[in-house]
Each structure stands twice: as C-alpha cells, then as structure tokens.
Amino acid sequence: MSLCRCSSICLRRPILRSFNFLNKYIDQSQHSGGLSSFQRLSFSNTGKNESTDDSNQIRCDADKTAADKKKQKQKEEEQAKIREYKRECLKVQKRVLAEEIRCSGEKDRILIQGMMKCLTDGMKKACTKIAKAKLIADKELAVQCAALSKKDKVKALLKKCEREKSKEKECNQNSPAEGDKDRTKKGKTKGKSGGGNKKRSTKENRAKKGKKLVKNRFTQKLEHCIKSEWADVCECRQNFTEDERKRLAASYKCMGTKIKSICRKRVIAEMCEAAGYVKSSEPKKKGKKKKNDEKKEKELEREILKEQAEEEAKIRGVVKEVKKKCKEKALKKKCKDLGRKMKEEAEKKKCAALAKKQKEEDEKKACKELAKKKKEADEKKKCEEAANKEKKAAEKKKCEKAAKERKEAAEKKKCEEAAKKEKEAAERKKCEELAKNIKKAAEKKKCKEAAKKEKEAAERKKCEELAKKIKKAAEKKKCEETAKKGKEVAERKKCEELAKKIKKAEIKKKCKKLAKKEKETAEKKKCEKAAKKRKEAAEKKKCEKAAKKRKEAAEKKKCEKSAKKRKEAAEKKKCEKAAKERKEAAEKKKCEEAAKKEKEVAERKKCEELAKKIKKAAEKKKCKEAAKKEKEAAEREKCGELAKKIKKAAEKKKCKKLAKKEKETAEKKKCEKAAKKRKEAAEKKKCAEAAKKEKEAAEKKKCEEAAKKEKEAAERKKCEELAKKIKKAAEKKKCKKLAKKKKAGEKNKLKKGNKKGKKALKEKKKCRELAKKKAAEKKKCKEAAKKEKEAAEKKKCEKTAKKRKEEAEKKKCEKTAKKRKEAAEKKKCEKAAKKRKEEAEKKKCEKTAKKRKETAEKKKCEKAAKKRKQAAEKKKCEKAAKKRKEAAEKKKCAEAAKKEKELAEKKKCEEAAKKEKEVAERKKCEELAKKIKKAAEKKKCKKLAKKEKKAGEKNKLKKKAGKGKKKCKKLGKKSKRAAEKKKCAEAAKKEKEAATKKKCEERAKKQKEAAEKKQCEERAKKLKEAAEQKQCEERAKKLKEAAEKKQCEERAKKLKEAAEQKQCEERAKKLKEAAEKKQCEERAKKEKEAAEKKQCEERAKKLKEAAEKKQCEERAKKEKEAAEKKRCEEAAKREKEAAEKKKCAEAAKKEKEATEKQKCAEAAKKEKEAAEKKKCAEAAKREKEAAQKKKCADLAKKEQEPAEMKKCEEAAKKEKEAAEKQKCAKAAKKEKEAAEKKKCAEAAKKEQEAAEKKKCAEAAKKEKEAEKKRKCEKAEKAAALKRQCAKLVIRAKEAALRKKCAIIAKKAKMAAEKKECEKLAKKAKEAIEWKKCAKLAKKKREAEKKKCAKLAKKEKEAAEKKKRCKDLAKNKKKGHKKKGRNENRKKRTDC
C-alpha cells in the first residue's frame, strides 16, 4: 500500500465526522421539543454526585466484558480475513497451474498429475504464509492511517481556531463601540436565561432524585472523551514542527472549548441512541470535495490493480518453487524404486546363473568320472600287454646271458691272472697319486688362508686411512661442504658392502658345492617320480582342456541368447520413446507459437502502462537514490575501517612469519646438530660392527679349521682300522695256513723232524716284532695330537687378549670425543640465546615504527577516499537512472527469447545424446572383436613356449637318467615313448588350431565389412545432426553476444570504479613498502656486521680447536701405529712358529701315512697271493684227501685236536687285549673331542646369537617386503583370474555382438525405410495439427476479447453504481433516522 492510498483512506474519517455534525444541527433545528428536553439537563457540576461504589463496579465489569467481546470479534475477523486471503491465493495458484498444464506436454502433465498431493500441500502452506503476511501488513497500515487521521483532525481544529481569531481581530478593529453594546445586551439576556435555567434545573432535580445515574454517566463519558481527544493532540504534537507547536500553544484555549463542544455533542448523541431517540440528518452539498474524491479513488484503483499483479507474480514464483520441490521428491522416489527393481532383477539373474553353473558342474563331474574309468581300463590293458612283452623279452635275454656267461667264465679264468697283476700295479699308482693330491690340497689351503689374511689386513688399513681422512675433511668443511659428507658416507658403505659380498661369496661357494652333491642324489630319485607324474599330469590336462572347451561353448551360447533378447527389448523401447518425444515436441512448438503471439499483444499493452509507471517510478527512485548515497557513504566508511583492520592483520602475519622463520632456523640448527651426532654414532657403530664381523669371521675360520682337522683325523682312524682289520685277517689266514702245514708236517715228522720246528719259531718272532712296532707308532700319534691341541689353545688365548686391548682403546677414544662434543654444544646454545634477545629487541622497535606509519597513512587515505566517493556518487546517480530504464525493457525481450532457445536446445541435445550412445555401442563391439583376436594369439604363443620348455626339460632328465642304473634306463625308454605320443598329439592340436585360426580370420573379415557399412551410415547421420546443431548454435550465439555486450558495458563501468580504488590502495601500499624496505636494509646491514664479527670469532675458535684435535689425533695415531707394529711382529713370530710346527707335524704324518699305505699294499698283495695259493691247494687237497680221509680220519683227529685248541686260545687272548686297548684309546679321544666341540659350540652359539639378532632385523625388513610382494602377487593373481574371467565373458559377448551386429544391420535397413514412411506421415499430421492450432488460437482470441468486453461492462456498471450511491446520499430525506457510525459506513460500502 502506498502513502497516497493511506492518506486518501484516512482523510475520509474527518469528512464523515463533518457530515455527522451537520446532521446533528439539522436535527436540533427541526425538533424543538427534543432540544428543550436536552436543555433541561444541567451541564454544570453544581449538583451533588451521590453515585455509589456498587454502580461503578457494575460499569467496570460491563466495560471489561465489552472489551473481551471486542477482542473476540477482532480475532474472528482476523481469521475470516486469513481465510479469504487463502481462498484468493489458492484461486490464483490453481489458475496458474491450469495454464501450465494446458501449455505443457504429455510427460509434464503425467508428472503434474502424479505430484498433485505434493502440490496441494505445498500450495496450502504457501498461502497460509502469504495470508498471515497480508494481515500483518493491514494492521500496520491501519495504525499508520489512524495516526494520519488524528494529525489531520488536529490540524483542522488548529485552522478553525486561527480563522476565528483572525475574524475576531478584524471585527474588533472595525467596530469597537458596537462590540461593547452587544456585550451589555448579551450579559442581560444571559442573566435572565441563566436564572430560568437554574429554577428549572432545581425543580427537575427535586422531582427526579432517584435518577442520579444519568448525571454521573454523562460526566464520566464527557471526561473520557475529552481525555482521549487531548491524548490524540499530545501524540500528534510529538511529530509537529516548531512552528506548528507554537501555533498550537497560542490556540490552546480555543482548542479546549471546541473539544468540549464536540465531546458534548458526541456524548449526547450516544446517550440518545441508547435511550431510543434517533435523529435524521442530511449532508450539505459539497461539490468541490467530490471531484477530489473521485480522482483519489481512481488512483487507488490503479494502485490496487498494481498490487494484485505483483501478488499474482509472487504466487506464480511460489508455485514454481513448490513444483521444483515436488519434482525433486518424485525423482528421488523414482530413483529408489528403480534401484530396488534393479537389485531384485540382479539377484534373480545371479540365482539363475548359479543354478545353471551347478547343473553344468554336475554334468561335467559325471563326464569326468566316465572318462577316468575308460582311461584306467585302457591303461590297465596297455600295462598288461607291455608286461607280457617284457617277460618274454626277459626270458630270451636270460637264456642268451647264460650262454654268454659260460663262454666268458672260461675266458675270465685265463684273464684273471693277468688282471690281478695289472690291478696290483694300478693300486700302487693310485695310493701314490692320493698322497700327492693330499699334499697339494694342504698347501693350497695354507696359501688361500694366508692370502685372505693379507687381504683383510689391507682392507682394514684402507678403512682406517679413509676414516682418518674423513674426520679431517669433516672438521674443516662442516660449514662449507655438507654435500661431500654424503659422498664419503656412501664410500664407506660401499667398502663395507664389498667386504660383506666377498665373505658371502666365499660362504656361498662352499654351500653350492655341498648343495650340488645333494642335488645330484635328489635328482636321481626325482627322475623316477617325475616320469610317473608327467604321465598323469598329461592325461589330466587333456581331460581338463576338453571340459573347459565344452563349458566355454555352452556359456557362450547362453550369453549370446540373453544378450540378443536384451538388446532387442532396449531397441524397441528406444524407438517408442523417440516417437513419443517427437510428437510431444511438435505439439509444444505449436502451443508455444500461439502463446508467443498472445504474449506479444499483451506485452504491447503492458509497455504502454509501464511507460506511465516509469515516470512515477523515476520520481520515487530519486528519493531512493538519495537514501542509497547515504548508505553507500556509510558503507565506504566501514570499508575504510575494514581496510585498516586488514592492514593491521597483514602486518601481524608478517611478524608471525618472521618469528616462525627464526624458530625454524633455530630448529634446523638443532636438527643439524642432532644429525651430526647420529652420523658420528652411526660411524662408531659401523666400526664396531666391522670389528665384530672380523672377530666372527676369525672364529668361524677357526671352527672350520678345527672341523677339517676332525674330519682328517676321522679319515685317518678309518684307514688305520681298515689296515688293522686287514692285518688281523692276514694273521688269521697265516695261522690257518700254519695249522694246516703243521698237520701236514706232523705227518711228515718222521721225515723232516727238527727243520719244521725252527721255521715256526722264526715266524713267531716276526709276529712279535710287528706288534711292538705298531704300539710305538700309536704312542707317537698320541703325542703329536697332544702338541697340536696345545698350540691351538695358545693361539686362542693370544687372540682373545688382543681383542680385549683393542676394545679398551676404542672406549677411551669414544669418551674423549663425547667430552669435546658436549663442550661445543654448550657454546652453541649460549650463542643462540644471545641472538634471540637481540631479535626480540629489534621486533619491539619495528612495531612502534609501524604503528606511527599506519596512523599517518590512514589519515591520507581517508581524505582521498572522501573526495572520490563524492565524485563517484554523482556519476553513479546519472548512469543508474539511464540503465534502469533500458534494462527493464531489454530484460523482458531477452527472457522471452531465452525460453524459446532453451526448449529448442534441450530437444536437440536429447536427440544428439541418443545417437552418441548408439555410436559408442558399435565401437565397443569392434574393440571387443580386436581384443579377442589378440588374446587368442597370445594364448597360442604361450602354449607353444610351454611345450618347448617341457620338451627341453625332458631331454635333460633323459640324459641324466641314462647315466644311472638300469632302472633309470627302463624309465627313460617309457618316458621317450610317452614323449613321442605327446608330440603326435601336440602336432594334431596345432593342425586343429591352425584350422580354427583360419575360420576366425574369415569371420573377423566379415564383421569388419559389416562394421564399416554401419560406420558409413552413422557418419552420414552425424553430419546432418552437426549441420542442424550449428544453425542452432549460431542463433544462440547472436543472442548471447547481444546479452554479453550489455553485461560487458556494465562490467566496464564497475571495473573502472574498482580500478580507481585499487590505484589508491596500491599507492598507499607502495609508500609503506618503500618505508619498510629502508628499515629492513638498515637492519640487515647491522645484522650482517654483527654476524660477520661472530663468524670471525667462531672461526678463530674452530681453528684453535681443530689444531688441538689434530695434535691429539696425531699422537693417538702414533701410539696406535706403534702398538699395531708390536702386535704384528708378535703375531708374525707366532705364526712362523706355528707354521714350522705344522710343517713338522704334517711331514711326520705324511711319513706315517706312506709307511702305513705301503704296509697295507704289501698286506693286500700277500692276502691275494695267499688266496690264490689256497684255491690251488684246496683243489689238490680235496682230490687227495678224498682218498686218505677214510683211512687216516680217526688217527689225525686224536693227534690234531689238543695242539689246535692251544693255538686258538692264544690267538683269542691276543685279539681281546688288542680290542680293549683300542677301546680305551677311542674313549680318550672321544672325551677330548667332546671337550673341544663344547668350546667351539659355545663360541659358535655366541656368534650365532649376534648373527641372529642382525638376521632378525634384516628378516623383519625382508618379511615386510615379502608381505608387500605377496600382496602384490595375490593382487596380480586375482587380477589375472579376473582377466581370464573377463576374457571368457568378452568372448561370449563378442560372439553375441557379432550376431547382433548382423541383426542390427538388417534392422537399420528396415528402420531407414520406416523413417521415410514416418516422415511422410509426420508431414500429413503436422498439416492437420497446424489447422487445429490455428482454430484454437482464434477461439482463444475471441474468448479473451469477450472477457475484456465483460470487464469493461463491469467497470462501467461499478462507476454507475457509485454515482447512484452518491446521488442517493445527496437526495436523502430529513425524516430518515441514523443508527450510528457503523451503520453509515456499511451503507456506503454496500453502495
């Protein structure tokens, strides 16, 4: 509501009151009796007020009830207004919805029908909010109107009083004498009339003593009325100017008299109405005011129409918002429903696929079992046949071998004698060669050990020299060359790694030799198992491949069928949707064109009305612009304050950054110090680790040497035991021979006699001498072993003593280094504390200087900003007025054009998206075909490579097996047969694969040709669509360019203003930065000078410390070198002595071994000769004894038994004694060996524990890396499985796509023919629809014309009614009665 409307409404009340006063005066002139009755009432307060308190309470209660009733009525009226506003709002919203539904397509209509509940609820809520807002606005307006009416009323009274005063002054100036006469006459008349009134009043009061309430009620109402009027005057006085207040104060008495007269008339009228006396009144004619009222009413009507249009626009906006919300809700519901359906369908598909897979697996298992049974039966038959053949061949071979053996037996006998001689000579040579080899091996080992020691010593010296150089370079170049440290550390690591690698390589070589021997034995066993497993694996692979091919073929067929069905259904749906969308688009275009024409007519009318409104709005805008300028000025001041705050914040940030940098520098220094400490500690650890490794390597060597010695000793013992056994066997044989000879000699005692006794004695002496020699040799061996043990223990003790000394020296060096570091760190900390204090003082000075500069700069900026604001505001006001006029007209035209373009673009985008999807699907088909070909080729290559590898491995195994026993040969033959069979099968497979390749290539060619045809068709379609899109884009560009030009002009203006402000700010910043730079340069100079002084002092200190350190290091080096020289000399002496001892011991051992070998060889020769003699003698004896046994058996037995018994007992005793001695010697040796082993085991345990700790750390790292690798491998395996599955799926899809592509090609042809038919049909339909749209447009225009005519008639009728009402008000008769203000208002509103 505008102020004009408020003033017009509020001015009606004083006009109505003037009518009421005139009516009252007319009633008083007509009804004299009524007036006399009123004059009888006493209007003075001379009478006594004898009213009671009870009556007052009753009146108060009545007033309260009346107030409550008024409140309830107000509430009911408000609710009724809200309902009416709601109804109006809903009517408008329904009308807007109906228009949208009428102009929208089928899809939108269906959507709106589905959203009706949501729309109705949203519209109702919006209408309630709008109605409440209107009611609040009406209340505010009523308050404003009441205030205006009061002001008008008071001003009217003021004017009346001023007029009366002016008239009185004129009268007093013209006729002062007449005024005196009139006063005397009036006084007389007043006296008479007053007396009569008094008398009447006294009589009436006496007659009406019971009617005291009338007086009290009249006085109360009159006082209440006067108070309310004066309260209105006081309220209005607050809003008056000083001149008006002075005028009011001058006319105070006049106002009081007029208020009393008005209140008396009002109270009398009210009491008369309550008593039933109603007086009629006729308003006087006032022609001048009627014309003003008519003009105001017309203006009010126009404003009302404007407000209605604005309300309708708001309601339409509300409807759009509600629609958007409802659409979003509907879309969410649809998405949820679709998601549920998709999940259900996916679950069903999964269940079906699982069921199919289970069936297929069951079928495959059954097929596999049948195939296995058949294969087993075939294999059994083959094995039986092969066994029969082998038996026959074996029997033949046995027969042949028996014949050959008989022949060879005769030949062997002849050759055995010659072979024996040759064997003896060969054995002698072998023994000699073995002795030589043993000597060479021992010498080589000694040389290797000496070379190793020399290498290790050289490496240690190198490492020590490098460490010395590194320390010197690090102390000199700590500040200058930090990069060199990394290089030196890298060199150290390389040295250590090389040393580790050399040790590991040596250990690996030994391990490889042992592993080779074990592998050879294991490979022989594996040959047999591998041959069997290969046969089984080959058979299983064949079965699995056949089963896989069957599965893949079945899956492909199923996938192809399902994919065909899905694609056909999808294509049908697409075609149906495209047809529907085309129809809807055609209908929308028709409706839009009809609507455009109607809009153009309506817009022309609106433009004419807007031109009028713009003029009025221009005047209002001027007022608003003035207010805006004030606001902008206030905002600029705020901006200036914000800029100041921002500057302060920026300066604070700078200070914080500087503080952070200082902290970071301090922390960096600490970190560098800590890094240095860590590096030094790491270097120490490395040195300690290197020393430990050297110790461990030395101990390992000792253990290995001890193990070698134990092995050699064990081998010697075995040789000795063998020799003893051979000797015992030879002695036994000799004893037997002697016994036999004795038997024969006893027979010939009579002949030979004493000769045989002498020979026996000689032989006994020889045996005794041999036993003595053996015992002496044993003693010598024991003594040599003891000496060797003692020498080894001495070496161990010397090495441990050396290690302890070295460790003690290292600890001393570490302690001295720690003390020096701590002293250096303390000095650094003190320097850092001094720097911090100086920096804190500098910061304080900087802050004070900054504050002073900021205050000076702020004042300058404020003055410049004020001048710019004033100039800019003037320009803005002029430009804004022009822009608003032009923008209002352009926006309407641009919005209409934009809506049309958006609709057209949406349709084209949808069609283009559909075509792009089809093109993408075809491309996928082609890519899948290519991938399948590549995958098939890769698999074939892999299979061929695997076959070649298997064939190579089999050949190697065959070669190894050929070297083995006869069993390996038999297995090799079988494996060859199996390999030949496999080769034949593989050749057949290759032929099959080549055939399948050819088929696949032919299919691919056909598919390529079909794909190329499709691509040509799609390209033609795309070209057409691109041409259409270009046209649309060009049109859109032109419209955009026009809109952008306007925006650019506006932006340019804004940028200019912003640029001016930025320039001011930049100038201020530059001045600040220049001042800050100067300060910073001065401070930097001072800091540099102070830093240079400190650096000089620090360098001098460092040079002194370095010189002292060098002296200490040189002394330490000299002492170390002297100590090392002494140690080396002592170690060299000990090594020489030990080497000489070893040589002596080895020489003694070699001599012993040579003698023992000779004895063993001689004993072996004798045993062979004895064995040969025995055979010959036994053969002769058997022939002779056979004849003599019967004769001499009894005599020989009796004579030989006692002599043989004695000899056997003596031999048994000797054997027992020798066995016991050997047992004792063995037990002593075992005890010593066990003691030595314990020592070695303890040392080995310590070494192992240290090694295990390192290994644990390394193993932990390796495990982490291994876990990562495992995860990667698992992921790769999973990815490989997925790829395999994807390949199978791709193959199935490709096969399906091939078929579908052929179907699509056919359908494309059919679709092209259908499109031509559809185009013809569309043209016919469009012609029919154009006619329909033209008819509809005509009907709409005619209907709108009729509506306009009806509205014009209604307006005329309303104007005529108003005229009639006014005429009726004028021509009312005097006898009509009034019933109060409310009834008069109702009558006027009814008119």
From Swiss-Prot:
Residues 184-201, 729-765, 934-949, 956-976, 1371-1391 have a biased composition (Basic residues). Residues 291-300, 517-577, 766-881, 977-1013, 1353-1370 have a biased composition (Basic and acidic residues). Keywords: Cytoplasm, Repeat. Residues 170-213, 280-300, 370-429, 516-577, 729-881, 900-922, 934-1013, 1076-1095, 1104-1212, 1353-1391 are annotated as: Disordered. One of its GO terms (biological process) is sperm axoneme assembly. It is found in: Cytoplasm. Sequence repeats lie at residues 332-347, 348-363, 364-379, 380-395, 396-411, 412-427, 428-443, 444-459, 460-475, 476-491, 492-507, 508-523, 524-539, 540-555, 556-571, 572-587, 588-603, 604-619, 620-635, 636-651, 652-667, 668-683, 684-699, 700-715, 716-731, 732-747, 748-763, 764-779, 780-795, 796-811, 812-827, 828-843, 844-859, 860-875, 876-891, 892-907, 908-923, 924-939, 940-955, 956-971, 972-987, 988-1003, 1004-1019, 1020-1035, 1036-1051, 1052-1067, 1068-1083, 1084-1099, 1100-1115, 1116-1131, 1132-1147, 1148-1163, 1164-1179, 1180-1195, 1196-1211, 1212-1227, 1228-1243, 1244-1259, 1260-1275. Residues 332-1275 are annotated as: 59 X 16 AA approximate tandem repeats of [KR]-K-X-C-X-X-X-A-K-X-X-K-X-X-X-E. GO terms for cellular component: cytoplasm. Signal peptide: none annotated. Testis. Primary spermatocytes and early spermatids. It comes from the Eukaryota. The predominant structure is alpha-helical. Possible structural role in the sperm tail. This is Axoneme-associated protein mst101(2). It comes from Drosophila hydei (Fruit fly). The lineage of its organism: Eukaryota, Metazoa, Ecdysozoa, Arthropoda, Hexapoda.
